[in-house]
Design a protein with these regions (language model features):
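Soluble C-terminal extramembrane regulatory/interaction domains of multi-pass membrane proteins
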Residues: 43-59, 63-144
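Membrane-proximal, non-transmembrane interface segments of integral membrane proteins
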Residues: 1-58
Length: 144
């Protein structure tokens, strides 16, 4: 059973499972940052969540990208979740401005990295398309 050409249900199921797990990490991050009771931090986490979900959508649209994105959907999100939990617990008790600045810098790095990975996956898909078009045009010229 094939959906999009070259993509089978096994691949789409793998992506669905990976995205489900990644969503759990995002949910845990969102729950944890609420403990910090800082609306700016909540908004900042939401911005990162949007960047992460953009990467999820890219992988869902082309499940072949899962291999290239797996580290982001698992390892990096797990680290982001763990860092958020530890930060929120510390910040709720201490209001440490340096911890807050460090955490915001981490979110900036994460958001940039996730957005870059999404762009790279999309541009790889574009490169594949450009190659296909070029090969087809060359064949058409040779036939003419």
């Amino acid at each position: 059973d094939k959906g999009a050409e070259g993509i089978d249900t096994f691949q789409t199921d793998r992506v669905a499972r990976a995205v489900d797990e990644a969503e759990k990490h995002l949910s845990a991050m969102r729950d944890a940052i609420l403990r910090a009771q800082d609306r700016q931090l909540e908004g900042r986490v939401d911005r990162f969540i949007a960047a992460a979900r953009a990467l999820f959508r890219t992988v869902e649209e082309d499940p072949r990208d899962l291999t290239a994105a797996r580290k982001y959907l698992s390892v990096y999100l797990m680290g982001a979740r763990d860092s958020t939990v530890k930060f929120a617990d510390l910040y709720a008790r201490s209001r440490d401005p340096q911890a807050r600045a460090d955490y915001l810098a981490l979110l900036d790095d994460l958001e940039t990295t996730f957005a870059d990975r999404s762009r790279r996956l999309l541009s790889d898909n574009r490169s594949d398309l450009d190659v296909e078009i070029s090969v087809l045009r060359d064949r058409l010229k040779a036939e003419a």
